[in-house]
Regions:
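C-terminal beta-strand-rich structural cap/linker in extracellular carbohydrate-active enzymes
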Residues: 413-427
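Carbohydrate-binding surface patches
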Residues: 362-397
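Structural preference for beta-strand elements that scaffold enzyme active sites
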Residues: 15-19, 48, 101-103, 170-172, ...
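Short, solvent-exposed turn/loop segments enriched in Gly/Ser/Thr/Pro and often Arg
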Residues: 50-63, 105-114, 174-180, 203-207, ...
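Substrate-binding/active-site clefts of carbohydrate-active enzymes
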Residues: 3-18, 22-47, 53-165, 186-195, ...
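Aromatic/acidic polysaccharide-binding cleft in carbohydrate-active enzymes
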Residues: 270-336
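Active-site-proximal helices and loops of the catalytic beta/alpha 8
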Residues: 174-267, 272, 300, 319-353, ...
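Conserved, mostly hydrophobic/aromatic
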Residues: 20, 41, 51, 75, ...
């Protein structure tokens, strides 16, 4: 019997994923050019390297001069811009040799309009009321949607996944909410026979996206439904609250109440991706221009329950998000190097009791969050001055002296309260 409570690996909650766009990672923009950087990426504290789409990009209705990697032409070959299949497999071997797992992006909601499937299997595509191929999201002009009411499409896609699973350790599934959960479950079971323990990260979508789809009569799955097939899901269900709280439009407590609600409303094995940025969102260093605030949010991103995501460049406080449609190599000399902090946070993350109940309290007036894990045996507490200011807050600890796991410094709890400077405390 397929049972996600058994199937999923709880250690993923203590893992870190590094998202890498081959085109922008180096001036060369190739698979081979990534390899020399792998030891550094591993040393940051990376368990899993996620390669954004590696497949050929369509020419028709292409965005920009080079095209978007999420408008792919062929699910079973690699983008010649990046190199050959041999180059890709060499990179995957190098990732494994550096002690990391490798997952690749799969974009199964849509293809480019000139996909290799258009002529071979025209029946695989969604048709608009006028009978023409199209998509359900108006501004995605460089793609056409697939139709999962066609059984043959399921077989083709699962065969593709099983082919890549010979080499990679799992998949990040684009717009996973709009592809049937029943398909993902069947795909997971098939891949498990090829790659036992494969990792499944799903891009679950914003709630308003689900609502818009359903109002039009289209399929869209909730996060609760997707947890029947995925190990890790995106935090987009509460992303607008994160943006509101970090932008000053909402109190911190509004965001953290939603985070606490997740803890008690999702299946016990749930795992939410903990991230401050990704390729579709603003850079954290641009969102948090106050350095102490950036460091506090970064520490919380590692401390909170769920797999942590780093987007390449985040470790050097990059403020510019590389274009998806052009070659914009990351300037690795531009910002402050956070690598030593990230490594310390990674080491702490590995020790967190992530099976315990997780909860966050916020002091809105001071801009401080107190997060903790607690069960009958474990207690781990983090104090995060998210506004970058000192303050004094209540903590669920007995009075006494404790060591800050992040700095090694002694801190004192007195009358159930702890005074924090602008720096994070983890006990």
């Amino acid at each position: 019997v397929f049972d996600m409570s058994i199937q999923t690996n709880p250690d993923l909650r203590r893992s870190v994923i590094y998202e890498l766009y081959v085109r922008s990672h180096t001036p060369q923009g190739t698979f081979r050019a990534v390899e020399p950087d792998l030891p550094r990426i591993r040393a940051l504290g990376t368990d899993i390297l996620w390669l954004m789409p590696i497949h050929p990009i369509g020419q028709e209705n292409r965005k920009g001069s080079m095209g978007c990697p999420y408008a792919n032409r062929d699910y079973r070959t690699v983008n010649p811009e990046y190199g050959t299949l041999e180059d890709f497999l060499h990179l995957v071997d190098a990732i494994h040799d550096n002690g990391m797992k490798c997952i690749i992006d799969v974009v199964y909601n849509h293809t480019s309009p000139d996909s290799t499937l258009v002529h071979r299997h025209p029946e695989y595509f969604y048709r608009r009321p006028d009978g023409k191929r199209g998509n359900k999201v108006g501004d995605w002009t460089d793609v056409v949607d697939l139709d999962y009411d066609v059984p043959g499409l399921w077989d083709y896609q699962i065969e593709s996944l099983c082919y890549w699973a010979q080499y990679v350790d799992g998949f990040r599934c684009d717009v996973a909410s709009t592809v049937p959960v029943a398909f993902w479950k069947k795909a997971r079971q098939a891949v498990e026979r090829v790659r036992p323990g494969a990792i499944w990260l799903g891009e679950s979508v914003h709630l308003d996206h689900i609502l818009a789809f359903r109002r039009q009569g289209f399929y869209a799955a909730t996060d609760n439904e997707l947890y029947d097939a995925f190990d890790v899901l995106y935090p987009y269900d509460i992303w607008p609250l994160y943006e509101g709280a970090t932008g000053g439009a909402l109190p911190l407590s509004r965001y953290f109440s939603a985070l606490n609600f997740q803890e008690l409303s999702f299946p016990t094995w749930y795992n939410k991706l903990s991230c401050l940025e990704n390729h579709d969102q603003r850079r954290a260093a641009e969102r948090f221009p106050n350095r102490d605030s950036l460091l506090a949010w970064t520490a919380l991103c590692y401390f909170q329950k769920g797999t942590t995501l780093l987007y390449a460049g985040q470790e050097i406080s990059a403020v510019h998000t590389p274009s998806l449609f052009e070659r914009e190599p990351i300037d690795w000399t531009a910002g402050e190097d956070l690598s030593p902090l990230l490594r310390r946070l990674y080491d702490i993350k590995k020790r967190l009791p992530t099976d315990a109940v997780f909860h966050v309290d916020a002091d809105d007036a001071q801009g401080i969050a107190v997060a903790f894990y607690q069960d009958g045996q474990h207690l781990a507490v983090g104090v995060f001055p998210l506004a970058g200011r000192p303050g004094t807050v209540s903590v669920p600890l007995a009075d006494g002296s404790y060591e800050n796991a992040l700095t090694g410094e002694a801190v004192t709890v007195q009358n159930g309260r702890l005074t924090v400077s602008a720096s994070v405390i983890i006990l």
